[in-house]
């Protein structure tokens, strides 16, 4: 039988909700042990507060940024972009947040992989962050390639470095974030035998670079897909995307069949 994770719907208590830079916020909440047991790549459906004058909306899917089972803590890193995240930005210490999760299928680390390369852009870096913690616990080396518009908008660098990861930053403003340069960086890591697998989130262009290298050089990988969702449980089918599975186009639900998928099967 396929593994079915435990899911809870509960009111978590906000511990902190602080700005990281001009665009991103770091939210920490106290929750149950079940919620705090979420794995890298999984997500929660958050019932965000409603800002004044905004229309009602559905729960917001949010990838796990960090967990602590011992302290029963759950962390999210989010960018304030719409009604949902504007509502999250209103939360202060002591407030309650309605959460449902952990949901979906997360990342899997093959015991044979000793060197991982994580490639992310924007909010995708939040999804990859828990991977660095788990990799360190298993004695696996991580090299992270972070992409952003400007250096001041790059997030999670300190977190990755605190877990022993090497971090390479590329940005639009410095003209270093283009696919050609990222491919050059990745080929260098491969030549140095520092890439047993790719892990990625946040950029279709960078996904295609990794797929091309993976296909040519036989390097496996996983991608966390970003998609709008309604239920988050696989019942409403609003998050369906097409995947190329052994030459056949197969429709899958990002929320329940993923959000983590085989790198080579994803269609940008």
What do these predicted regions represent?
Residues 227-259:
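Local cysteine-cluster metal-coordination motifs and their immediate loop/turn environment
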Residues 2, 251-268:
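Short, basic/aromatic-enriched C-terminal tail that caps enzymatic domains
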